């Protein structure tokens, strides 16, 4: 575990957490949650194992968290994520663990969801002096590179003053997760995009690093979910 004050971490503390994991040769598990019960289970497991952890919500998980009684699906996705974040903020320090609070894959259609969460995040930061979420993810890997980087730059410009980090995706991860997926795990498809290209990473670094902190979800042939035997070639 990193030698940090327990609770939700962000900014320099987030970098310290990642640095401790690298130095200690261990991974930070990222666990998707969809209810207060699953959040509590993750916190309890982390505390028992004296391990820091990433707690994250997909858009569907956030909607489920808000409950089926909310008929406005978009509002449910926003309020569910905010409610879950507040729950983690309240309890994490009492479990004695450091938590990176993150939202999972958001494609082009979910950019408004991320922006709505930033609206809440800016209000939270103004009141508490810290961000609501540690980081968000934009998965625009199916879109042209220029659109991917320009949108990531625009969103990161909002996030940087809040001491938040942005996760981006370069190269397509095959399969599907919570409705966000790609069909390139099919053996008949041209799967060259399943492998992140070094020149794309360099371009992202040159474009985004002057704005704020970001991380890259790199693809090396890995896929989400179920796939046919022989179709996955990791390299």
PLM ranges: what are they?
Residues 12-20, 36-96, 107-235:
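Alpha/beta enzyme core
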Residues 1-29:
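N-terminal amphipathic alpha-helix/helix-capping segment at the start of soluble metabolic enzymes
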Residues 28-32, 101-103, 137:
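Short catalytic-loop micro-motif centered on adjacent basic/acidic residues
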């Amino acid at each position: 575990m990193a030698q940090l004050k327990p609770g939700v971490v962000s900014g320099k503390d987030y970098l310290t957490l990642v640095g401790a994991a690298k130095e200690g040769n261990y991974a930070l598990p990222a666990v998707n949650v969809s209810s207060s019960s699953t959040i509590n289970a993750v916190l309890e497991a982390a505390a028992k194992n004296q391990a820091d952890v990433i707690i994250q919500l997909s858009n569907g998980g956030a909607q489920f968290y808000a409950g089926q009684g909310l008929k406005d699906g978009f509002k449910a996705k926003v309020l569910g994520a905010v409610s879950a974040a507040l729950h983690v903020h309240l309890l994490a320090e009492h479990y004695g663990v450091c938590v990176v609070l993150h939202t999972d894959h958001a494609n082009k259609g979910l950019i408004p969801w991320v922006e709505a969460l930033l609206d809440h995040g800016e209000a939270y930061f103004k009141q508490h002096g810290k961000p609501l979420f540690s980081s968000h993810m934009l998965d625009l890997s199916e879109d042209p590179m220029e659109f991917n980087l320009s949108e990531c730059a625009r969103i990161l410009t909002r996030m940087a003053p809040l001491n938040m980090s942005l996760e981006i995706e370069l190269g397509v991860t095959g399969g599907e997760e919570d409705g966000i997926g790609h069909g390139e795990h099919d053996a008949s498809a041209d799967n060259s995009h399943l492998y992140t290209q070094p020149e794309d990473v360099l371009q992202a670094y040159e474009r985004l690093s002057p704005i704020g902190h970001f991380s890259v979800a790199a693809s090396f042939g890995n896929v989400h979910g179920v796939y046919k035997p022989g179709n996955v070639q990791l390299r």
